[in-house]
Amino acid sequence: MKELKLIPPNDPRVQSAIAPFTDELLKEEGFKDRQELVDCMFLVMKKFGGIGLTCNQVGLPFNMFVAGGHEGIEKGMSFAMFNPMIVSVSKEKIRMKEGCLTYPFMFIDIERPQKCVFKFEDKDGNTKEAHLDGMMSRICQHEYDHIVGINFIENVSKLKLDMAKKKAMKQIKRMEEYRKFNQVLDKNQAWQS
């Protein structure tokens, strides 16, 4: 299976809209079929603790995302959407904190429609429609934004973004200190053995 890696937020591939997906392009990028791409995407998403991931977040030029697959969210419901389009959204909106694998440890309060309808192709190339509500609706809307070139940091004021960045940097620093502490601890335990 092909190994995919998250790319940094300043990479232009993360910040630009993606052309429609084609199976020919899939082969050019070294995947045997859609299922292999889906498997690779879910693997990366779960490795980093995500609940959604688009191809441009791993540097691939595919109009596709995966979402869900965690027991605690919509009973493990998951999607792999190729060439997704939002058909409709509800007037009712919900504000909630969102995170993003492209921006580790950053959480921003975002308002989105409570419900939405997506039209997409599945891994077999069949056209489907999904009526989504709640968390899965939010996840798929967030991933769709990536596909059309919108990053979630664009949906917030500069002040709120600066505050979120500051909190993220504190968390990253704490994680780094924890990692260093564990390395020292591991060396000390090895010495005592």
PLM feature spans:
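Positively charged
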Residues: 1-193
